[in-house]
Amino acid sequence: MTTDDDSAPFGRSLCAMVTPFTGSGALDLDGAQRLADRLVARGCDGLVLSGTTGESPTTTDAEKAALVTAVREAVGDRAALVAGVGTADTRHTVELALAAEKAGADGLLVVAPYYSRPPQDALEAHFREVADASGLPVMLYDIPGRTGTRIEPDTVVRLAAHPRIVAVKDCAYDLLGTQKVLSRTGLAYYAGCDEQILPLYAIGAAGYVSTVANVVPELFRAVLDAFDAGDTGRAALLQRRAVPLVESMMAAGLPGTVTAKALLGALGLPAGPVRAPLRSADRETTAGLLAAYGELAADAGQSQA
């Protein structure tokens, strides 16, 4: 379910959902359905499946399609489903895009091809070929720290002319470049780094794709709601309150997948282990995550008292 709002085609509050596994490491579709239902019930109007946080490098094509089908069954039309289909191979990416469309996705998240580091003209051709292949709208995923290749602002501007390229997940840490694209296109920008949600929203972003939302789905939705209501002071306060948890989950030297699953597991929510080469968080790390979570929960309780 994409929205009717061109400024936020996949909703405002998106979670980069983890992919739950069983204790033996198999895909846990029942757990995925329960987690997805919880996320939507608590404020997410969009879910990104099989992204980085969803361990897309270590799930099979069949698992990716099954995940979309199961989550669609769980959430119905209450949330948009964006399927991560990006790979280092254009042909494979197209195959995944077609499979995601058939499984019931509303949109595609397409990352810049990694490792091969194509030049900008080849990068542009890659995205156009994927966008041409299916009828689904596309969210470009700009995260050069992981892929080794930046989707340069001028390339994004050219790609914005494609009728199915409608959005960008922004993890480039380039505020000037983001504003350049926003000023020259109608693309919907989504903050892909939790610490940048309010700053990017304040300059015209559509919303966010958050890893931290796996644990606290209502947190950043409240930031956007406060800002939209004109209470910018409260929006800033809520964003700052999130800093300890965001730092623990996203800036402590471990991938967000690892920290999100550790905290979800500690809270008794569907998650399971991560797949190799990732390794699950140790007890000390998990204790630190729980402490940051508890601090945020205590702050929220005091503000409501």
Swiss-Prot record:
Under the heading CDD domains, the entry gives: DHDPS (cd00950)
Which reaction(s) are listed as its catalytic activity?
L-aspartate 4-semialdehyde + pyruvate = (2S,4S)-4-hydroxy-2,3,4,5-tetrahydrodipicolinate + H2O + H(+)
Q: Which GO terms describe its cellular component?
A: cytosol
Record's subcellular location: Cytoplasm
List the catalytic residues: 141 (proton donor/acceptor), 169 (schiff-base intermediate with substrate)
Q: In which pathway does it act?
A: Amino-acid biosynthesis; L-lysine biosynthesis via DAP pathway; (S)-tetrahydrodipicolinate from L-aspartate: step 3/4
Q: What is its EC number?
A: 4.3.3.7
Q: Which InterPro entries match?
A: Aldolase_TIM, DapA, DapA-like, Schiff_base-form_aldolases_AS, Schiff_base-form_aldolases_CS
Q: Does this UniProt record's set of keywords contain Membrane?
A: no
- What processes in GO biological process is this protein linked to? diaminopimelate biosynthetic process; lysine biosynthetic process via diaminopimelate
Record site: Part of a proton relay during catalysis? 52, 115
Q: Where does pyruvate bind?
A: 53, 209
GO molecular function annotations of the record: 4-hydroxy-tetrahydrodipicolinate synthase activity
| Record keywords, A-Z | Amino-acid biosynthesis, Cytoplasm, Diaminopimelate biosynthesis, Lyase, Lysine biosynthesis, Schiff base
Q: What's the stated role of this polypeptide? A: Catalyzes the condensation of (S)-aspartate-beta-semialdehyde [(S)-ASA] and pyruvate to 4-hydroxy-tetrahydrodipicolinate (HTPA).
- Subunit organization: Homotetramer; dimer of dimers.
NCBIfam families assigned to the protein according to its UniProt record, in alphabetical order: dapA
Q: Which family does it belong to?
A: Belongs to the DapA family.
What is the protein's given name? 4-hydroxy-tetrahydrodipicolinate synthase 1
Gene assigned in the entry: dapA1
